[in-house]
Amino acid sequence: MTAALVSGLLREGYSFAAQPISDLGIGPNAWIMNASLIGTGVLAVIFALGFRRLLPRLPRKGLATGLLVTFGLCFAAAGIFPEPSPDGPVTIAGIAHFVLGFFIAMSALTVALFLIASGLRKQRGWDRHASYPRVTAWLVVALILLTQLFFNRSSPLFKLGIGGLMEWTLFTTWSIWFIVTGLTLFRRGTRNTRNSSSALSGTTAAVTPTKEGAP
């Protein structure tokens, strides 16, 4: 999101409130936005693999991980296939951009969030974290609908010119979830490793014989 913000600030005449974020993927400095999409997708895949390793007992973990990986790959694809020019014809790359980078990516992420929330609620020590992915999932659903309504030219809401603001809010919402959850997993993983090392050291000390009568 930081790269997209920088790209928007560098783009003369770009409206954060009215224009889609994808508009930054074409025209001057488009590489900043497209590289950001690819990088974010790769990071989401890495997150999914770390999530799978650090939560071994999560119910339906495999499905949730697969959906997060799908989200990451599709989001990265949005950077590989930028949207078409507004004045140009519909292209296969443009269709791939919207279908993969938005509809499939957002659908996969939403379902994954609901699965994660359900699984965390049943896992000891993580139940208090279950509400955050659930709330995030519902916010994502609501913001997707609002984004489509505000960008739909046949909708009376289109005249308000805040479709871009809705999309920025959507992307910020799920980005914060990834950051907060990633930090939580890292902190817990570090703590568990430290506790395991301490327990191993204590066990080793307990079974090591004491040498008596040594000169």
PLM feature spans:
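Short, intrinsically disordered terminal tails adjacent to the first/last structured region
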Residues: 194-215
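Hydrophobic, aromatic-enriched alpha-helical segments typical of multi-pass transmembrane helices
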Residues: 1-20, 24-190
